[in-house]
Design a protein with these regions (language model features):
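Noncatalytic, solvent-exposed loop/strand surfaces
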Residues: 22-332
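Positively charged n-region of N-terminal signal peptides that target proteins for export
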Residues: 1-6
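Bacterial N-terminal signal peptides
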Residues: 8-21
Length: 332
């Protein structure tokens, strides 16, 4: 989940992002970029801008959104709430990144509504350069080619039950190799179990669905995170945080490989998690609702709470996901 911004501000931010994209050759295929770490290798990018300075073009958006643009070559893809309260329409836009013109729009569904401060356009799209996938907060997942032709559609809520997050669904799907990973970590407004869903990116078919029980109560099971990919030696794991703990999962089966508690030492019942876990150089960084923030060492098995927590500190971020370059961890 990304906290909603005012409409005017979201237009300015989009213009700045596009301005950076025009001078950058690097694709930005999903939330937090090609390596899922929020870092770009491009140099000499603008560091100052206003409503006029370093802005190549502006594109007015019909409503606010918590999702981020993704970029592939000359295309920008956007998950858009159309602001039509009568129908609550969501749509998917492809934009020419050099001109700021909308190339095509495709409907994603109706029923958009506000859940506290966010609407149903919070999940960011993801692409592999040929296909682009977009998920709405209503659980509709669609695949399109770059010309806007729909390839397949899934309705996750219809298949597996309604999402039960207090602030509405806001996780972005993770694309790793040939699959999409969709986390549904909830509990405040449902008794249904949390789970991680793996979907074949080409066909849209479920490969596996792994339930993820935790002892968290009230709002604490709710998490708005996007999964991280941990590479440790010749092993790869999908990492989740939520429900008072961090877990690592086998990409082939979904099986939970390890679990570390410590994100809610005071057992607060409203400890929902917004900032996503990150994995870098043998460490997994994960936070909760500000306190604590912790680093977990890779390579564990089973309950690793007492053996693999490298460090913790208080006053971590509530919403923003940190960035690391391997030497420093940057938090807002």
């Amino acid at each position: 989940m990304r906290r909603q911004l005012s409409l005017a501000f979201s237009i300015i931010v989009l213009a700045c992002l596009v301005s950076l994209a025009v001078v950058s050759a690097e694709n930005w295929p999903q939330w937090r970029g090609p390596m899922l770490n929020g870092i770009s290798n491009e140099k000499n990018l603008p560091v100052k801008w206003s409503t006029e300075e370093n802005v190549t073009w502006k594109l007015a958006m019909p409503d606010r959104s918590g999702s981020t643009p993704i970029i592939w070559d000359n295309l920008i893809f956007l998950n858009v709430a159309d602001g039509t309260k009568a129908t609550g329409t969501l749509s998917f836009w492809a934009v020419d990144r050099t001109k700021g013109t909308v190339l095509w729009k495709k409907p994603l569904g109706t029923g958009d509504h506000m859940m506290r401060k966010q609407n149903m356009s919070s999940p960011s799209p993801v692409t592999d350069g040929k296909t682009v996938w977009v998920l709405t907060g209503m659980g509709v997942l669609r695949a399109f080619d770059f010309k806007g032709n729909e390839l397949w559609m899934r309705d996750i809520q219809k298949e597996y039950g309604k999402f039960g997050l207090n602030w509405g669904y806001g996780s972005s799907p993770l694309l790793y190799e040939d699959s999409l990973y969709v986390p549904v970590l909830h509990g405040m407004r449902t008794d249904d179990p949390s789970y991680l869903l793996k979907i074949d990116k080409a066909t849209g078919k479920t490969i596996w669905r792994h339930e993820r029980p935790t002892p968290a109560q009230m709002e604490s099971p709710d998490a708005y995170i996007t999964p991280a990919v941990l590479k440790n030696g010749n092993k790869t794991e999908i990492v989740l945080s939520g429900g008072d703990c961090v877990t690592g999962h086998d990409p082939a089966t979904g099986k939970e490989l390890w679990r570390a508690y410590g994100l809610n030492p005071q057992n607060i019942q409203f400890n929902r998690i917004v900032n996503s876990p990150i994995a870098f150089d043998g460490l997994i960084y994960a936070g909760s609702r500000g306190n604590p923030y912790m680093a977990v060492k890779a390579g564990g098995s089973g309950d690793i709470t007492n053996t693999h927590i490298a460090w913790t500190f208080a006053n971590g971020p509530d919403v923003p996901t940190p960035v690391t370059d391997g030497k420093y961890l940057y938090l807002v």
